[in-house]
Amino acid sequence: MATKRTFQPSNLKRARDHGFRARMATADGRKILARRRAKGRKRLSA
């Protein structure tokens, strides 16, 4: 039996798990955004 590929892309799932509003919803998520702003990331979230 062949092993299935584990990455099954979906823009909706991506946004729900890693999107800006998902990050803003928790204190730790806001810390992630703060870190990425401090680092100077062009894109803060998915």
Curated annotation (Swiss-Prot):
<dbReference type="InterPro" id="IPR020939">
    <property type="entry name" value="Ribosomal_bL34_CS"/>
</dbReference>
<dbReference type="GO" id="GO:0005840">
    <property type="term" value="C:ribosome"/>
</dbReference>
<dbReference type="InterPro" id="IPR000271">
    <property type="entry name" value="Ribosomal_bL34"/>
</dbReference>
<feature type="region of interest" description="Disordered">
    <location>
        <begin position="1"/>
        <end position="46"/>
    </location>
</feature>
<dbReference type="GO" id="GO:1990904">
    <property type="term" value="C:ribonucleoprotein complex"/>
</dbReference>
<keyword id="KW-0687">Ribonucleoprotein</keyword>
<dbReference type="Pfam" id="PF00468">
    <property type="entry name" value="Ribosomal_L34"/>
</dbReference>
<comment type="similarity">
    <text>Belongs to the bacterial ribosomal protein bL34 family.</text>
</comment>
<feature type="compositionally biased region" description="Polar residues">
    <location>
        <begin position="1"/>
        <end position="11"/>
    </location>
</feature>
<keyword id="KW-0689">Ribosomal protein</keyword>
<protein>
    <recommendedName>
        <fullName>Large ribosomal subunit protein bL34</fullName>
    </recommendedName>
</protein>
<dbReference type="GO" id="GO:0006412">
    <property type="term" value="P:translation"/>
</dbReference>
<feature type="compositionally biased region" description="Basic residues">
    <location>
        <begin position="32"/>
        <end position="46"/>
    </location>
</feature>
<dbReference type="GO" id="GO:0003735">
    <property type="term" value="F:structural constituent of ribosome"/>
</dbReference>
